[in-house]
């Protein structure tokens, strides 16, 4: 047979489109041409494939080889196409039987000696392969990742010769058994580590229960970072589908992640906009996507470049980020929970009782203006974190651990899911009218607050959402005036 077709997958955002590798062998001067919008790593595969075929004991044809990667308008990058290209050549030259690979897809980079090397995006590719009802052949190092999918046939090999022996019926490769991933629910941080700070701890619990964004403000050393790092430990565990969704993102990004834990990302304040939202010629996920279904913590918020912070405004509302390129748009999920921390002034000690702050009123104003009003308006809870007194630090009275707080958060979660099918932070204005019914006292209270604090419509709705969460934590169907009062206290003077 002089023509062969092999199936593989590309990566486009979080999708894995099907790619057909067509190999044609014809008479002519020995050459190997790859067409179909192949990028550098794919074009270089011709040398790896030639050496791998020869070193695996097969013949590399001394004829004209044309390899077409279809569809032609889809960019192909990475070295995962090495294995399908090599197998296509072997089938087209009659060294492997025809049609035995029809219900298979192949990914894998080839070493010069024929060994298979691991590739990125395995889980995303495996999920697409499963939907297509195909089997998957891949490098041994990627087997456990792909085998997380139930009822999916995965074949793993160390060497090109091993793959060929499987299809020659010389030595069959066993199906990799489905891996029941051990969910790592043990967090190294616990809220019991935090001394004092009852009000900030309460705000953290409310944020966890309703999925709300939160801003901690206070001088250095008061526990802002400590509190933020405890948030994942009080959040409900991811369900199996969410686990796979998060794992596929980290697979594409080629980044380590503890399976079963909610992501916690804390980029440095020198991070660029591309590092935060993602990008590149073939766009890759940024920090907000890596924090999907988890927590994005921005410490020293005013130290971030203002343009970098402004890119957060759209994904905070839409829960996704769209990256546009000349030929296409890539959409990445960005359903993260924003937790931020900041000092009140450049030195950090403004409004402190010990009068250490030497910053002028103008410098304090300039420092705080680095964060735009529209961004602050999108943060649900604003909370001051005061310095701890000596007796609070020395207090040995046991405080609530994360497991205890998480029980209350889980209960509030269930109330919300049963009532409206989602968390309170995502309630639309129409849903607010249905699920947030205020009595006469509360209505007067919110009207007065709107006038005094000059609340925007967005801030008004966010206060109602927070009050709904506080009521859910109290297991109350109706929102009481005490719930609304507490929600207003977390709004501060920013609106």
What do the PLM-derived regions correspond to, one by one?
Residues 1-215, 219-225, 324, 460, ...:
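Peripheral, non-AAA+ core regions of ATP-driven protein-machinery
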Residues 41-46, 61, 68-78, 283, ...:
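Basic, amphipathic alpha-helical bundle interface domains used for macromolecular binding and assembly
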Residues 60-63, 100-101, 131, 150, ...:
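Short loop/turn elements that form and flank the Walker-type P-loop nucleotide-binding site
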Residues 112, 296-297, 303-304:
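Residues immediately C-terminal
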Residues 169-206, 210, 238-288:
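P-loop NTPase nucleotide-binding/switch module
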Residues 215-256, 318:
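Walker A/P-loop
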Residues 218, 278, 300:
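The Walker A (P-loop) glycine that initiates the GxxxxGKT/S ATP-binding motif of P-loop NTPases
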Residues 293, 299-300, 311:
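Walker B catalytic acidic pair
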